[in-house]
Regions:
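Charge-rich, low-complexity N-terminal segments
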Residues: 1-24, 31-37, 48-130
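Flexible, surface-exposed loop regions and adjacent strand-edge segments
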Residues: 44-46
């Protein structure tokens, strides 16, 4: 397998998911400097009404976000990546495969929405979610 560095291409941007029971966030870092170039999260103003409704519901749910919210966060990230000219990102495959099963489905939804929006997600095709 030929690496991008040997071909003279710059290393790809790294997409990282930050997942908890309260929120899901995704950030894209620059390859050499590790600075964040784009970010989206489920606690942005667009999701406040949904979060409030979910938190005041009885019985309470354990997660404050689901696959639908994760997909919308992915769409927002893809729009921001298009705005700055990033067309390809890479995920840490080992980290994604080590996630608990109940976080994998929404993570797959988020990564799939980024890919459907036109940003190539390297490594997404190797993930197998339940």
């Amino acid at each position: 397998m030929i690496s991008q560095v040997s071909m003279g291409l710059p290393p790809p941007h790294l997409l990282r998911l930050i997942v908890s029971c309260r929120k899901i966030a995704v950030e894209v870092t620059a390859p050499r400097t590790s600075t964040i170039v784009a970010m989206a999260a489920s606690d942005e103003p667009e999701f406040l009404v949904q979060n409030h409704a979910r938190n005041t519901r009885f019985p309470r749910t354990r997660l404050c976000w689901d696959a639908r919210v994760a997909a919308r966060v992915g769409e927002k990230l893809a729009i921001r990546l298009h705005d700055i000219g990033v067309s390809s990102v890479e995920i840490d495959l080992d980290e994604e495969l080590s996630r608990p099963a109940h976080f994998r489905r929404p993570a797959a939804s988020l990564l799939g929405s980024v890919a459907r929006a036109g940003v190539h997600v390297a490594g997404f095709d190797k993930l197998q979610y339940p």
